[in-house]
Amino acid sequence: TSTLTFTLSEAATDFVEADATVTGGSLSNWTAVSSTVYTATFTPTADSTTDGVISVSSSKFSGSSGNTNNDGSDANNSITFTVDTVRPTIAITDDDDDNSLSAGDTSTLTFTLSEASTNFVQSDVTISGGSLSNWNAVSSTVYTATFTPTADSTTDGVISVASSKFSDSAGNSNTDGSDANNSVTFTVDTTTTPSPSPSPS
């Protein structure tokens, strides 16, 4: 959010929040600090890259003598914010055709981010039924790792990334922690059949 200050050249009693033209977001917390100074909070639209623009057109309010304002096109009568409130997402894929792992099997996982990130790390990944190794940043949007199922186990291997684990260059944290493409599940059977005991001669 950003706090905006509207400074009038003369006192006015009829300058109100509705006099401000707002795109790409909304105003709140409108406050008359004095008859010439007003403040408000600008909040950009969620999940958007549309610039936020706040301005006041001419003839929106008047001074004590009844003269209406006339600087609707002046440069200091408009503020523009570059906005990026789009939260990055992630998709996880694997190289195993049937998602079934036996003793000695491993699978290469690929984590594909919708936006570049510099703080996505292995510890952001939630793992059960096995472990990750060989973490590799192929690029700022693609990461790979090797999943190894737990030995002597029939517990499914599950790999996922929860929301709010990493962020993009604008500081937006990731979302879609519960999306279907944000989790991979392996059927695991790494139990081994014991070798038969030799028969007595």
Q: Which residues does each PLM region occupy?
A:
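Non-catalytic beta-sheet/beta-sandwich ligand-binding modules that flank or precede catalytic cores
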Residues: 1-201
